[in-house]
Amino acid sequence: MTSAASPVRSAAHLKVLSAGAVKYVLTDFAPRFTRDTGDQIDFTFGTIGGVQKRLRDGETADIIMGTAPAISQMEQSGVIAAGSRVDLGRTLTGICVRADTPMPDISTPDGFKQTLLKARSVAYTNPQAGGTSGIFLVGLLERLGIAEAVGKKALLCINGDEVVDKVSAGDAEIGSTFLSEIVPMKAVKAVGALPPPMQNATAYAAGIMTGSSNPEAAERFIAMLTAPAQRNAWLSLGFEPAGHG
């Protein structure tokens, strides 16, 4: 008597709603995930403030990725399924210039301050749009006493991609956003992270949205994304991965 064949798992179609800082890690990994599992993924990226607004407006997803405090709050409020939160890693705020221009000195707090003051224009994410790096930078400028001077020549952007675009096009002399949004881009070069005394590592996490229609596939995606085998990919794209495995 022949035993019945195991049912074939049908491919899932995952929807991921994510903060932009993780964008290039995800888009680098997604083709390999689809090749290995057959599952398809649709991404929607924005600032964490934009992600939160989409959720308030009733948008749904299978996976949500954002700053670690925001994901923890979503888990506490029931937006994310209890126990599904996973740390992804952290990235630093950095400075970029066009690929064909000299590198300014930001190795010290004073060097960083003078670089911003001397720059013709500075692009960064709009804090009012919920851009994490922009919120941090504006607070730092206020502490340094140069918020007004830099603000007069600021180009406020909707996300890190626009920051990079402004710099690569020559509209902004200097750009500031997360290194994970700078390092993958060829048209600009990373000057580096802000000097240690004023640096703020931003941690990111993921979780499965309560009511996801594909919780098993979502869990599989997060597990494969954070596996030790992916560590070098995270590092090469400006992220320090969390210590999974």
Pin down the residues of each PLM region.
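Short active-site loop at a secondary-structure junction
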Residues: G83
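Exported/periplasmic ABC-transporter solute-binding proteins
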Residues: M1-T44, G49, K53-T60, A68-P69, ...
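Internal catalytic or translocation cores that form aromatic/hydrophobic pockets or channels
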Residues: I63
